[in-house]
C-alpha cells in the first residue's frame, strides 16, 4: 500500500555517493530516462527510501523529471518542481527553464511556465522573461541574414563564411553589409576558448562585414540541447536539434526580421550535417531560407577549428596560426600562455612549489588558489599582446596584478609570470623586442632578478633553458628536470627573500647536483626538505612557465 502523502519526504540525493547515484539511474531508467549532468537532484521518498518522484537542476535548468507509475496519483510533481524552482532561486536564478515530455506541459503551465519550443518528443519551457528580454534586445538590430557560430577559435574558414554570406545578401551595396548580416556567438562556456574571447575574435574577424550581437542561452546551449530524457543518443540529438531550430524559427529570426540563415557545409561531422539538413527541412515553414556555403579548404581538406585546437594542444603555434586571421592571433597566444601556466602548476614533485600533490613551502597558497589566479589574469593577456605602447603594456600589467590580488585575497601568486608573459606576448617571443620593451617599462616594482633577465632579452632562456626543455620534453620528469636546470642557474629573488643569499646559492648548487644524479627518490626527498625549510623557487616557476610558452610559440 502506498505511503500517505504527509509521510513522503522530498530530499537531496547526493550523486557523488555511488549508492545514491545508482539508485537515481535505476529510477530514471525504469521511467525511460537517463541521468544527465546536474548540480542537484531532489527526490520524493517513501518510508522505505524508495524514489517515488525525482528531478534535477543544472544551473537554471530543471531536468531528469520523473514520477514512478505507482505514485502518479499522489500529486508529487507540483511540490517537487516547486522545490526545484526554490533551489534555483537560492542559487540566484530567477528565470528557470525546463525540458520535459509533451504530456507534462499542463503541470508546468500550472506553475507559471510557458512553451518556448517544441519537438515531437520534448518541449522547452521557462517561467520568466528571459527569451522575451533577449528578443527585445535583438529587435534593436535588423538583419536579412544570420550566422550562429561557436568560433572555437575563429579561423580563416569562419572568415570565409562571413565574407560569402555578406556577399550574398548585400548585392551591390557593400557599405550596408554590416547592417544586413548578424552573427550570434554561442555563449555556452564549454569550449576551449571562453565566450568573451570568442566574442572578441568574431568581432575583430568580421569587422566591416557583419554586426556581432551578444549570445544567449537560447541557441546551441545547455538550454536548447537537452539529452537527458532519451536513452538513444542519436534520438536525443535529433530531438535537441529540432528544439533549437524551432526556437530560432519561432523567436530569434522574427526578432531580427531575418529571412536567411547561413551555414557552412559539413563534409566530415555527421551530427552537424544532420543539423544542416534539419534546418533546411524546418526553417522554410517560418519564412527562413537556409543557405549552405561550401567550406573553405586547403590541400589537407576543409579548414576547421578542430585542426587549430589540435595544433595548439600539441604546442604547434605555427601550424595553428596558418589557419587563422591575424585578428585571432592574440587569443591563440593567450591560450598558449594559460596552457603554460597550467602545465607548470599541474606538474607534481616541484621542490618548494605548489602543485596538485603539495602546497610546497607555502602556508598561504594551494592548488585551487593558483587556478583562481590564472583565471583572474587570463583576460588581460590578449590585450597585452595587442598593446600599442610600452605605457599601455605596463598599465595592463598593473591591472592584471590587481585582479590577481583580488582573486587571491592579497597573495602574490603570479606577479613574475604576468611581467614575463606580458613581454613575451607583446613581442611575439622575439628576444630583442622583449629586451627593448623591458628597458622602457621596468620600474621599481619589478624585482632586480626579473628586471635583469628581461633586460637581457631572457638570454638564459633562449641559450640554455629552451634547448634543454626540448631535449627532455618526452621524459616522464621533463618538467621537473627543466625546473632544476632553471634553478641551478637563476638568481631567484624569491629564494633569497625567504632564506637569505647564502642559502639561495646553496639551493642553486643542490638543484644542479640533483639534476646530475637525478632520481625520483632524491627529488621527493628534496621536495619534503624544501617544504619544511621554507625554500620556494617562485622565480624559477615563472621561468618554467615562460619556457613552456616560448617552446609552443616558436615550435
PLM feature spans:
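Conserved beta-strand in the GNAT
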Residues: 43, 49-66
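Conserved glycine-rich acetyl-CoA-binding loop
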Residues: 64-79, 91
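Conserved phosphate/anionic-ligand binding catalytic regions in large, soluble enzymes, centered on
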Residues: 408-425, 534-549
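Conserved acetyl-CoA-binding loop-helix of GNAT-fold acetyltransferases
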Residues: 73-86, 157-163
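Nucleotidyltransferase catalytic core that binds NTPs
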Residues: 100-333
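Phosphate-rich cofactor/ligand-interacting catalytic cores and adjacent structured alpha/beta frameworks
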Residues: 333-395, 399, 415, 427-528, ...
Amino acid at each position: 500500500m502506498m505511503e500517505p502523502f504527509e509521510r513522503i519526504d522530498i530530499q537531496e540525493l547526493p550523486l557523488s555517493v555511488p549508492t545514491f547515484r545508482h539508485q537515481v539511474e535505476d529510477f530514471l531508467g525504469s521511467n525511460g530516462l537517463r541521468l544527465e549532468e546536474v548540480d542537484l537532484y531532489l527526490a520524493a521518498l517513501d518510508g522505505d527510501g524508495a524514489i517515488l518522484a525525482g528531478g534535477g537542476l543544472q544551473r537554471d535548468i530543471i531536468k531528469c523529471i520523473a514520477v514512478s507509475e505507482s505514485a502518479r496519483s499522489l500529486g508529487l510533481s507540483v511540490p517537487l518542481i516547486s522545490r526545484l524552482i526554490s533551489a534555483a532561486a537560492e542559487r540566484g536564478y530567477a528565470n528557470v527553464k525546463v525540458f520535459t515530455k509533451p504530456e507534462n506541459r499542463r503541470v508546468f503551465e500550472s506553475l507559471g511556465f510557458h512553451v518556448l519550443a517544441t519537438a515531437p518528443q520534448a518541449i522547452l519551457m521557462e517561467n520568466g522573461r528571459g527569451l522575451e528580454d533577449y528578443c527585445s534586445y535583438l529587435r534593436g538590430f535588423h538583419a536579412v541574414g544570420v550566422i550562429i557560430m561557436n568560433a572555437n577559435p575563429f579561423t580563416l574558414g569562419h572568415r570565409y563564411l562571413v565574407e560569402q554570406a555578406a556577399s550574398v545578401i548585400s548585392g551591390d551595396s557593400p557599405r550596408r553589409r554590416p547592417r544586413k548580416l548578424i552573427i550570434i556567438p554561442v555563449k555556452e562556456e564549454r569550449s576551449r576558448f571562453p565566450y568573451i574571447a570568442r566574442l572578441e575574435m568574431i568581432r575583430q574577424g568580421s569587422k566591416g562585414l557583419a554586426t556581432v550581437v551578444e549570445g544567449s542561452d537560447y541557441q546551441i546551449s545547455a538550454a536548447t540541447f537537452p539529452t537527458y530524457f532519451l536513452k538513444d543518443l542519436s534520438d536525443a540529438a535529433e530531438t535537441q536539434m529540432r528544439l533549437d531550430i524551432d526556437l530560432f524559427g519561432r523567436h530569434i529570426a522574427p526578432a531580427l526580421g531575418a529571412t536567411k540563415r547561413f551555414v557552412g557545409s559539413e563534409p566530415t561531422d555527421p551530427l552537424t550535417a544532420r543539423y544542416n539538413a534539419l534546418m533546411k527541412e524546418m526553417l522554410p515553414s517560418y519564412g527562413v531560407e537556409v543557405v549552405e556555403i561550401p567550406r573553405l579548404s586547403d590541400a589537407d581538406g576543409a579548414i576547421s577549428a578542430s585542426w587549430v585546437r589540435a595544433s595548439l594542444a600539441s604546442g604547434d603555434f605555427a601550424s595553428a596560426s596558418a589557419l587563422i586571421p591575424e585578428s585571432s592571433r592574440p587569443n591563440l597566444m593567450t591560450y598558449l600562455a594559460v596552457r603554460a601556466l597550467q602545465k607548470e602548476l599541474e606538474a607534481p614533485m616541484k621542490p618548494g612549489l605548489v602543485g596538485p600533490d603539495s602546497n610546497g613551502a607555502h602556508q598561504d597558497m594551494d592548488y585551487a588558489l593558483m587556478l583562481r589566479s590564472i583565471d583572474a589574469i587570463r583576460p588581460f593577456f590578449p590585450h597585452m599582446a595587442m598593446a600599442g605602447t610600452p605605457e599601455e603594456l605596463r598599465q595592463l600589467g598593473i591591472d592584471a596584478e590587481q585582479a590577481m590580488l583580488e582573486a587571491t585575497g592579497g597573495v602574490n601568486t603570479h606577479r613574475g609570470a604576468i611581467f614575463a608573459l606580458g613581454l613575451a606576448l607583446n613581442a611575439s617571443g622575439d628576444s630583442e623586442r622583449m629586451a627593448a620593451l623591458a628597458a622602457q617599462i621596468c620600474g621599481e616594482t619589478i624585482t632586480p632578478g626579473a628586471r635583469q633577465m628581461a633586460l637581457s632579452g631572457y638570454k638564459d632562456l633562449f641559450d640554455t633553458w629552451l634547448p634543454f626543455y626540448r631535449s627532455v620534453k618526452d621524459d616522464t620528469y621533463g618538467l621537473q628536470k627543466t625546473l632544476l636546470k632553471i634553478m641551478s642557474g637563476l638568481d631567484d629573488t624569491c629564494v633569497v627573500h625567504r632564506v637569505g643569499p647564502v642559502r639561495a646559492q646553496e639551493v642553486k648548487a643542490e638543484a644542479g647536483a640533483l639534476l646530475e644524479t637525478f632520481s625520483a627518490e632524491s627529488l621527493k626527498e628534496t621536495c619534503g626538505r624544501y617544504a619544511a625549510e621554507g625554500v620556494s623557487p617562485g622565480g624559477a616557476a615563472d621561468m618554467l612557465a615562460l619556457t613552456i610558452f616560448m617552446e609552443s610559440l616558436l615550435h
